[in-house]
Amino acid sequence: NRLNFLVYSMLLVLLVNVDMKVVLRNYVVVAGILVVGVFLLSLVGMVPNLQYNRAGVIRNSFGFIYPTDFASHCFYLFLAISYLLKDKFIWTRSLFGVLLSAFIIKYCDARLNAMSILLATVIFIYFYYSNGKKLKIFALLPYSAVVFASIVTYLSYKFSWSNPFLVSINKLITGRLALGRNAFDTFGVHLFGTRNVQFIGSGGKTESVIGYNYVDSSYVQMLFTYGILPVVLLIIIYVVASRKQYKDGQYLLVAILSLIAFNCMIEAFWFVPTYNIFMFLLFTTNTFSKKESNDIVAINET
């Protein structure tokens, strides 16, 4: 886990001042080939399509370990492609977003990622037609990781089966709070991570796993795997970089980062470059010019 943090941090540093478009294009090509390739191979049986049963609903993983892994890849790819094409094909991309969301609900039952794709679709539509209009709420977006990390960490730590409100939330998010509370009870939280911490997931098995204790929430999980100081440092970096993008007028990017921060209250990929490439764009050079973007929108509208 510490090695992962070191490698990911090095990538964050190595991408400083790199052209954001170049990074996104490379991500779309590499991740796109991987996801589409594995998906197709799972359809023809060359890669196992693990199917999970949740309350009578069959959830397909399409070649990945778990359905939410596949759904998360789709979410981040949709964000990357849509951001690259943010001034083009708005209704084609919007239709694709709706269809992709419906597909994920029907075949993966990954509700959060399906909802996140729909929210992303709405966000891209809004910014396409808003022509760079600034809303007061945008000033709060750079602090989204602080808010969402604090909420899910607090609720997980305070979770109790005797609290009906927290039990209701736990049920809504399929047991995430209970798993987080179990981690707090089982492992200590330290400044630089908990030694020998081990989260047991499905491990490629579709039946129930004895001792399952996998914590999905990125923020809660990283408290144990990376430690308090690295998590706080990452959040500070996020806030500083997001504030800079906000001051530069890159409101769409800040909104995307906020949506991802919300998604990672439940999902485990906030600081994983194979999924969330946007976290690693924080210090790249944003070559998506605000002025150019507004000019293109104005031309399209006429």
Enumerate the language-model features and the residues they cover.
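Transmembrane alpha-helical segments and their membrane-water interfaces
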Residues: 1-35, 237
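Alpha-helical transmembrane segments of multi-pass inner-membrane proteins
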Residues: 26-46, 67-124
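Membrane-interfacial helix-loop-helix modules of multi-pass inner-membrane proteins that assemble, modify
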Residues: 33-70, 171, 207-210
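Membrane-interface helix-loop-helix junctions at transmembrane boundaries of multi-pass membrane enzymes
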Residues: 85-95, 133-139, 241-256
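A membrane-periplasm/extracellular boundary helix in multi-pass inner-membrane enzymes
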Residues: 128-167
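Long extracytoplasmic/lumenal interhelical loops at the membrane interface
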Residues: 165-226
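Hydrophobic transmembrane alpha-helices and their immediate junctions
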Residues: 225-261
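Transmembrane alpha-helices of multi-pass inner-membrane enzymes
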Residues: 257-261, 271-302
